[in-house]
Curated annotation (Swiss-Prot):
Coiled coil: none
Example GO BP: translation
Protein name per Swiss-Prot or TrEMBL: Large ribosomal subunit protein bL17
Pfam families per the UniProt record, alphabetical: Ribosomal_L17 (PF01196)
GO function terms (MF aspect): structural constituent of ribosome
Paired cysteines (S-S): none
Keywords assigned: Ribonucleoprotein, Ribosomal protein
Database matches in InterPro entries: Ribosomal_bL17, Ribosomal_bL17_sf
Assigned GO CC terms: cytosolic large ribosomal subunit
Gene3D superfamilies (UniProt xref): Ribosomal protein L17
Organism in which the protein naturally occurs: Streptococcus suis (strain 98HAH33)
Ribosomal protein found in the keyword field: yes
Family: Belongs to the bacterial ribosomal protein bL17 family.
């Protein structure tokens, strides 16, 4: 096959890719194994491209993949309520406008020292 199986069944692999993609969109940088970083790079690129398109269909496609997780919660003293933004909202309102002039490669993979314990090659994947 043309893709990495990452030692998981297809459903486990898809769930892991969704989780890592959502985490990267929320935190803008994560530490993971090198193989996982190379694999989620493709999905993150697709999500940011959908965010740049910005239409309703692109929003629906991104919502089908990105987890519905709260990215940030801010307290509004005037209304005495918390306002929260999901990962999908952050993708379309904060991340996509940053890459309006860029066409490809929205992520960067930096190799780090091997993981302690099993010496797996580790990497930091971050949004450029």
């Amino acid at each position: 096959m043309a893709y990495r199986k990452l030692g998981r069944t297809s459903s486990q692999r898809k769930a892991m890719l969704r989780d890592l993609t959502t985490d990267l969109l929320i935190n803008e940088s994560i530490v993971t194994s090198e193989a996982r970083a190379k694999e989620i790079r493709n999905t993150v690129e697709k999500m940011i491209t959908l965010g740049k398109r910005g239409d309703l269909h692109a929003c629906g496609q991104a919502a089908a993949f990105v987890r519905n997780v709260i990215a940030s919660a801010d307290y509004d003293e005037a209304t005495d309520k918390y306002t929260s933004a999901t990962a999908l909202h952050k993708l379309f309102s904060e991340i996509a406008p940053l890459y309006a002039d860029r066409t490809v490669r929205y992520t960067r993979i930096l190799k780090t020292e091997p993981r302690r314990g099993d010496a797996a090659p580790m990497a930091i994947i971050e949004l450029v």
